[in-house]
């Protein structure tokens, strides 16, 4: 089997940038996805350029912070911010203009590309793929990239995806045992499994803007542990990135 350990939220805070960098340099993370509207975007770009082996994707968002474009009336609240989570976006989905979605996501992609970063894949913040999949699919075809597989989507066409997407390494599931369980479920197969991760060093920026904080430092510890790397080697698990699909 093959595993892609993808680190979400690249750029959400300086601590997240450095936590992901540590998980790449000393650990099993080979892919990460960058938030174009994040506070530490410039730092993330700098780190990405200094570490060309780190595979970069776009962490497309309609539920974090402010959009890059103005005048997106169906996607924002009265203060011009995106709705805060999946549920809030879903509840107003009937009134969402998908042309606005496409324009904003295109702007996010182009900002990353314009910073000199090559993008290999797309995923989304708060896993909103089922709500915007036709737009995401269209953009993936346009830019020639892979995307994260989602259980609510059955037809990916010619777009490359991992075979499975596993979210169990999150919150109370952040443990070495969780990864062992994932491996045991797929060992001996040719499956490519993406494991979602959120490693970060905790800083004030992260505390202010994210509800998922404390487990992130534990993720760094596990993803960089010799124990995990030895186990994956013993099980002959190949660690790859989205570039390798």
Curated annotation (Swiss-Prot):
Entry-linked Gene3D superfamilies: Glycoside hydrolase/deacetylase
UniProt name for this protein: Carbohydrate deacetylase 1
Binding of Mg(2+), residues: 59, 125
Subunit relationships: Homodimer.
Family membership: Belongs to the YdjC deacetylase family.
Keyword field contains Hydrolase: yes
Alphabetical list of PANTHER family matching this protein: CARBOHYDRATE DEACETYLASE, YDJC DEACETYLASE FAMILY MEMBER
EC number, as in UniProt: 3.5.1.-
Keyword Metal-binding (UniProt): yes
Role according to the record: Probably catalyzes the deacetylation of acetylated carbohydrates an important step in the degradation of oligosaccharides.
Top EC class of this enzyme: hydrolase
Cofactors named for this entry: Mg(2+)
GO biological process: polysaccharide catabolic process
Organism field: Listeria innocua serovar 6a (strain ATCC BAA-680 / CLIP 11262)
One Gene Ontology term of the molecular function aspect: deacetylase activity
Keywords: Carbohydrate metabolism, Hydrolase, Magnesium, Metal-binding
Superkingdom of this protein's organism: Bacteria
């Amino acid at each position: 089997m093959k595993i892609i350990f993808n680190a979400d939220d690249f750029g959400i805070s300086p601590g997240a940038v450095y936590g992901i960098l540590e998980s790449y340099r000393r650990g099993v993370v080979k892919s990460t996805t960058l938030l174009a509207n994040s506070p530490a975007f410039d730092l993330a770009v700098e780190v990405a350029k200094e570490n060309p082996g780190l595979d970069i994707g776009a962490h497309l968002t309609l539920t974090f912070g402010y959009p890059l474009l103005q005048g997106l009336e169906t996607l924002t609240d009265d203060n011009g911010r995106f709705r805060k989570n999946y549920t809030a976006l879903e509840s107003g989905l009937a009134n969402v203009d998908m042309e606005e979605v496409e324009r904003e996501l295109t702007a996010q992609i182009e900002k990353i590309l314009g910073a000199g970063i090559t993008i290999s894949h797309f995923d989304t913040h708060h896993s909103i793929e089922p709500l915007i999949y036709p737009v995401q699919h269209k953009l993936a075809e346009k830019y020639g990239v892979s995307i994260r597989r989602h259980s609510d989507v059955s037809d990916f066409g010619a777009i490359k995806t991992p075979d499975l997407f596993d979210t169990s390494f999150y919150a109370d599931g952040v443990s070495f045992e969780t990864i062992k369980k994932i491996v045991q479920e797929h060992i001996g197969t040719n499956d490519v499994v993406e494991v979602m991760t959120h490693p970060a060093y905790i800083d004030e920026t992260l505390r202010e803007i994210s509800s998922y904080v404390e487990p992130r430092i534990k993720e760094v510890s596990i993803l960089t542990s010799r124990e995990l790397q030895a186990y994956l080697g013993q099980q002959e698990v190949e660690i790859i990135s989205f570039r390798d699909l």
